A protein has these predicted regions:
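A short helix->beta-strand "capping" segment at the edge of beta-propeller domains
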Residues: 6-10, 18-47, 81-83, 263-267
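WD40/WD-repeat beta-propeller blade N-cap
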Residues: 42-49, 88-95, 130-137, 173-179, ...
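Short coil/turn segments within WD40 beta-propeller repeats
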Residues: 47-50, 59, 67-71, 93-96, ...
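Loop/turn segments within WD40 beta-propeller blades
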Residues: 52-58, 98-104, 139-147, 183-188, ...
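Conserved beta-strand element within WD40/beta-propeller blades
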Residues: 61-65, 107-111, 149-153, 189-193, ...
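Short loop/turn segments that connect beta-strands within beta-propeller blades
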Residues: 75-78, 121-124, 163-166, 203-206, ...
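Blade-loop segments of beta-propeller domains
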Residues: 81-107, 124-134
Length: 326
């Protein structure tokens, strides 16, 4: 059974903190996490965790798993006892993604059963709120249209839904390939698909539609693992299977002073021989970048398959800190 725990450290502000809290860092080196301050989850999911989402309004965490369940945990930082599921509900196949609505009173998940389900934390009842012809890979909450659900599927469509009072499809958008990753900010939806394609849509609340505003090939050479919208909504950060991140802008003319552009890419989540005893001296292990998250100040964190989380400053293009969990 996979082990799931909440790691507690002195607050670093913007990471998981309330909106507007300042982000701080403690150095540029790498630290290895001990288990002394973990809050263990018992029981944890019985299969791999596919996605997690924190509530925007409370100390709650939703966890989607390949064992077909979504588990919702209420975190009490004053209680040292193991954290147990507060609520849970089930899909008819592996659950691939999960999110909260803006008010934090609903958990929405999508999965291999081709539907999105909404669990109402006020009534403790799940309901189907969206459907596709193939598995739903991504779910995100959109603040446009008075609050709406966005679903991205392997059927090569992205759909926007009103889920109250009854589930209603607002619009369906075609994308070039199967949806692999997705994010939203303001009126913007950014989608990464198979075959290294990136598309962006801007919602029009007056007409109830969304128009494509960007279409490009990924700046990375290999398969996309994750994507995150920049806080200003003018671009995105993209993580790939080759241990590399690209920060890209929709409009990026050369600076008239030096000809430089704002976009950049960098290597991360890689281990050379000195870091890993199983790697030959002349080789480096490349790990996928599985998650990217920004705080409101523009610094961001990446989580990699090497078991580490790294913190980065977008403005100075530098790494602030890395933490290894195993």
């Amino acid at each position: 059974m996979p082990k799931l725990s909440f790691f507690q450290t002195p607050s670093t502000g913007g990471w998981g903190a309330r909106t507007g809290a300042p982000a701080t860092t403690t150095g540029t080196g790498a630290a290895r996490v001990s288990g002394e301050q973990d809050m263990e989850v018992t029981p944890g999911p019985s299969d791999s965790v596919s996605a997690m989402a924190f509530s925007p309004t409370a100390d709650m965490l939703a966890v989607a798993s390949w064992d077909t369940y979504v588990r919702i945990y209420r975190i009490d930082k004053t209680n040292a006892q193991p954290v147990q599921p507060y609520q849970q509900y089930q899909h008819e196949g592996p659950v691939l993604d999960v999110c909260f609505n803006a008010e934090g009173n609903k958990v929405i998940s999508g999965g291999a059963d081709k539907v999105a389900r909404c669990f109402d934390l006020n009534t403790n009842q799940p309901a189907v709120v969206a459907q596709h012809n193939e598995p739903i890979r991504c779910v995100r909450w959109l603040r446009a249209f008075g609050g709406a659900l966005v679903t991205g599927s392997w059927d090569k469509t992205v759909k926007i839904w009103k889920i109250e009072p009854q589930p209603t499809l607002i619009t369906s958008l075609d994308v070039p390939e199967r949806v692999y990753a997705m994010d939203t900010i303001g009126l913007i939806i950014i989608v990464a698909t198979a075959e290294r394609k990136i598309v962006a849509f801007q919602c029009n609340e007056a007409t109830g539609t969304a128009q494509q505003v960007a279409a490009l090939d990924s700046p990375l050479k290999y398969q996309t693992r994750c994507i995150a919208a920049l806080p200003e909504g003018d671009g995105f950060a993209l993580g790939g299977t080759e241990g590399r991140v690209a920060v890209h802008y929709f409009h990026d003319p050369p600076d008239p002073k030096d000809g430089r552009m704002k976009k950049f890419a960098f290597r991360c989540h890689r281990r050379a021989n000195a870091d890993h005893p199983d790697v030959p001296r002349t080789e480096t292990l490349l790990y996928p970048v599985n998650a990217i998250v920004f705080n409101s100040q523009g610094t961001f964190a990446t989580g990699g398959g090497d078991g580490s989380i790294s913190f980065w400053c977008k403005a100075s293009r530098t790494r602030l800190k890395s933490t290894y969990f195993y």
